[in-house]
Curated annotation (Swiss-Prot):
First-tier enzyme category under EC: transferase
EC annotation from Swiss-Prot or TrEMBL: 2.1.1.74
Species of the source: Acaryochloris marina (strain MBIC 11017)
Keyword field contains NADP: yes
Gene Ontology BP term (one): tRNA wobble uridine modification
Entry's localization field: Cytoplasm
Source lineage: Bacteria, Bacillati, Cyanobacteriota, Cyanophyceae, Acaryochloridales
Residues involved in FAD binding: G11, G12, G13, L14, A15, G16
Record's protein name: Methylenetetrahydrofolate--tRNA-(uracil-5-)-methyltransferase TrmFO
SUPFAM superfamilies: FAD/NAD(P)-binding domain
Keywords carried by this UniProt record: Cytoplasm, FAD, Flavoprotein, Methyltransferase, NAD, NADP, Transferase, tRNA processing
Length: 465
């Protein structure tokens, strides 16, 4: 192995641990850098240990059922030989229909497993700058150190790195009531690009009062300071509390919007149809399956968001794939910077995964680590990188983050709204998700079996675990 330059993985979270394992299992040396050290009292504001793959929030990887987004991703990762999912299965604790783990045992076991691998060198200490040479996988997460963040900032450019996630809810398009919502742009300028949910005065006042009274989630201390310096992150509930009409002069502004189904908006008999306020939704993906509630960045608790936002006419049955959030979250503008292989466009030997690239959730971070690690070792071996089938949950997620509109890019969790449509529509949602699952797992099986080298790599990973 003297002639093999080790691949460097920066960050020992879920993505980094998975990436390092895939590299090592392929027979290539890897240096896994982890900044945290209990002995040296060097931890992040959110971490409590220096173990690899520490779960800092929930101990749950999400729903187990494979006709759910998280569960399908679990199933795909099992096929691909993921060490994270294997250890999650081993250390599972009862949690209803979710895959939850004993987080202490889970992280300790992964740390021991990686440290004992002959191809893995675990280095404790901060990496203050992006390495210039060799193949590198960046998985430093949402709490990347200040020095490395500055190095990444210089590499990506000022406009392509975010430090605070203030995002509006994202809704499944087919759950929006089109009998109420209408397509239009303000003053009919250009293409009808927005779905508009009109409110009369009574509806608006009820919504405003509910929003003012709704319960907020508390920002952590280290997030409060960041929020002070984030331009334009005023939560919709704070805007509501500033006055009854504040939202009507902001994101719920009604001027220039009229439902053409009523006819000419100038006609006197149609004056009664002019909305008092309008909530707008902007298309989030190319296929128009996901819609973003414009200007609704919020710090409300998730249950409150669903209750209050479903008061908006047309959103009574809205299905949320991502709730609004406001928290510290260092992430890059992936559509501008990354290929679906998770390589940086301007430096193909630098790859990234985890929350840093705008995927949300433990399982998505694991999937990103799998792909980035797999492609890193393929590049080191002189092979072409691979992309996962877009019909899979993992493949569709990486296709989405690398092809979304850069201007409005916000992190995305796994969800069925980003998977390509079926050839024939299945009306029942649960049945449709089951068909998505069957197609995804069949396509992934065929994909794994296609290139002989790749088949051997995945088979070796699965067998040796």
């Amino acid at each position: 192995m003297d002639h093999q330059q080790p691949i460097q993985v920066i960050g020992g979270g879920l993505a980094g641990t998975e990436a390092a394992w895939q590299i090592a299992q392929a027979g290539w040396p890897v240096i896994l850098h982890e900044m945290r050290s209990v002995e040296e009292e060097r931890l992040t504001p959110a971490h409590h240990t220096d173990q690899l793959a520490e779960l800092v929030c929930s101990n749950s990887f999400g729903a187990q059922a494979s006709d759910r987004a998280a569960g399908l991703l679990h199933a795909e990762l099992r096929q691909l030989g993921s060490i994270i999912i294997r250890k999650a299965d081993e250390h599972q604790v009862p949690a209803g229909g979710a895959l939850a783990v004993d987080r202490g045992v889970f992280s300790r076991n992964l740390t021991e497993t990686l440290a004992e691998h002959p191809n893995v060198e675990l280095r404790r200490g901060e990496v203050p700058t992006l390495p210039i040479d060799g193949t590198v996988v960046l998985t430093s997460g949402p709490l990347t150190s200040a020095a490395l963040t500055e190095s990444l900032h210089q590499f990506t450019g000022q406009d392509y790195l975010s430090f605070f996630d203030a995002a509006s809810p994202i809704i499944v398009g087919e759950s929006i009531n089109r009998d109420v919502a209408f397509l239009a742009s303000r003053y009919d300028r250009g293409e009808a690009a927005y779905l508009n949910c009109p409110m009369n005065r009574e509806q608006y006042l009820a919504f405003w009062q509910a929003l003012c009274a709704a319960e907020q989630a508390e920002l952590k201390d280290f997030e409060k300071e960041t929020a002070k310096f984030f331009e334009g992150c005023l939560p919709i509930e704070e805007m509501a509390r500033r006055g009854e009409d504040t939202m009507r002069y902001g994101p719920l502004k009604p001027v220039g919007l009229f439902d053409a189904r009523y006819g000419d908006f100038k006609a006197p008999e149609n004056q009664k149809y002019r909305p008092y306020a309008v909530a707008q939704l902007r298309q989030e993906d190319k296929a128009g399956k996901l819609w973003n509630l414009v200007g609704f960045q919020t710090n409300l608790r998730w249950g409150e968001q669903k209750r209050v936002f479903q008061m908006i006419p047309g959103l009574e049955s809205a299905e949320f794939v991502r709730m609004g959030v406001m928290h510290r979250n260092t992430f890059i503008n992936a559509p501008e910077l990354l290929h679906p292989t998770l390589q940086f466009k301007q430096r193909p030997t630098l790859l990234a995964a985890g929350q840093l690239i705008g995927t949300e959730g433990y399982t998505a971070a694991t999937a990103g680590g799998w792909l980035a690690g797999t492609n890193a070792v393929r590049l080191a071996q002189g092979l072409n990188p691979v992309v996962l089938p877009t019909t899979t949950m993992s493949g569709s997620l990486f296709e989405f983050i690398s092809s979304a509109t850069p201007k409005h890019f916000q992190p995305m969790p796994p969800n069925f709204g980003i998977i390509p449509d079926l050839p024939q529509r299945v009306r029942n949602k649960r049945e449709r998700y089951g068909v998505y699952r069957d197609r995804a797992l069949a396509d992934l099986t065929a994909w794994i079996a296609e290139p002989s080298l790749f088949r051997q790599t995945v088979a070796a990973n699965s067998a040796s675990m």
